[in-house]
């Protein structure tokens, strides 16, 4: 009897062992994944851009200098330009920046462009009369032509929006200064009997500037980005050119008196719309 019980216990133990082993075989171990190293999001970057500035209409005003003797000598009138525009052209820029996180970055940029500028104004009625023209007809006008070189130094901040695959849209804004330098201005009086041609020294000045940006960057690699964007740049107004040699003379064909000095014309500033493409390299 005891021998039979022992055999029964051994059989039960064997069955239990086999059942436990089979159950263990059915348990699937979940794989353990090691977290991938994340690229460093903070760090410095360099950028370079080229762009195209579209034609920009603006405004301006100029003083008419009376060359006759005292008490008539001096500024008779101030006239607004009927048309005053900055032509389109290429722009170039470089910059250095710093990324704080995956949303916020800032940079300092230096940009340059050069463009022709043209102004047109109808002659005053008394000038038309002096040429024997009908003073109320559109038969006489002035044309002013020059070129402007514009440098901008800007401090910018950007917000990178959520990524869509390799694309990262962004919005930005900047403030800074613009250095505007005009070449010599050439003025022509246009009418059937007009002969006036004069050169006027262009002025240069520092001005306040602000910008708004929007665009998208494309990941060429994890460090190199292709940047496509739009920028609106506002440059405040300033002096454009001085008086010609005849106006500056103390003695002329009409008599003697103080010569003209200082700026004769001022522009109202520029609203410049630019499309740009560039590369941005981020150090990691």
UniProtKB/Swiss-Prot annotation:
InterPro entries: OMP/PagP_b-brl, OMP_b-brl. The keyword Signal applies. Keywords: Signal. It comes from the Bacteria. The keyword DNA damage does not apply. Residues 1-23 form the signal peptide. Belongs to the surface antigen msp4 family. This is Uncharacterized protein BRA0921/BS1330_II0913. It comes from Brucella suis biovar 1 (strain 1330).
